Every structure is written in structure tokens, then in C-alpha cells.
């Protein structure tokens, strides 16, 4: 699922977020803040 350009895909819960995704170390973006 692709997100609109101004949204970010958070891979853990597969949500499109208007806020930044929380990260853990060097892992990919995980979830919405």
C-alpha cells in the first residue's frame, strides 16, 4: 500500500501517518508517533 506524498508509511502497523514514524536504532520506520 502506497501513501500519499505528504504521508509516511509506518511499516509495523502499515499505517500512513501525517506525523513522523518512531524509529528504533537503524530499523526501518516502525509506527506512528
UniProtKB/Swiss-Prot annotation:
Signal peptide: none annotated. Expressed by the venom gland. Coiled coil: none annotated. Its main location: secreted. It is found in: Secreted. Residues 23-24 are annotated as: Essential for stimulation of [3H]ryanodine binding to RYR1. GO terms for molecular function: calcium channel inhibitor activity; toxin activity. Disulfide bonds join 3-17, 10-21, 16-32. The record marks 31, 33 as: Essential for stimulation of [3H]ryanodine binding to RYR1. It comes from the Eukaryota. Transmembrane segments: none annotated. InterPro entries: Scorpion_calcine. Keywords: Calcium channel impairing toxin, Disulfide bond, Ion channel impairing toxin, Knottin, Neurotoxin, Ryanodine-sensitive calcium-release channel impairing toxin, Secreted, Toxin. One of its GO terms (cellular component) is extracellular region. The keyword Nucleotidyltransferase does not apply. Belongs to the scorpion calcin family. This toxin stabilizes ryanodine receptor 1 (RyR1) opening in a long-lasting subconductance state (60% of the full conductance state). Furthermore, it triggers calcium release from sarcoplasmic vesicles (31 nM are enough to induce a sharp release, and 65% of the total calcium is released after toxin (100 nM) addition) probably by acting as a cell-penetrating peptide (CPP). In addition, it has been shown to dose-dependently stimulate ryanodine binding to RyR1 (EC(50)=3.7 nM). The presence of a 'disulfide through disulfide knot' structurally defines this protein as a knottin. This is Vejocalcin. The lineage of its organism: Eukaryota, Metazoa, Ecdysozoa, Arthropoda, Chelicerata.
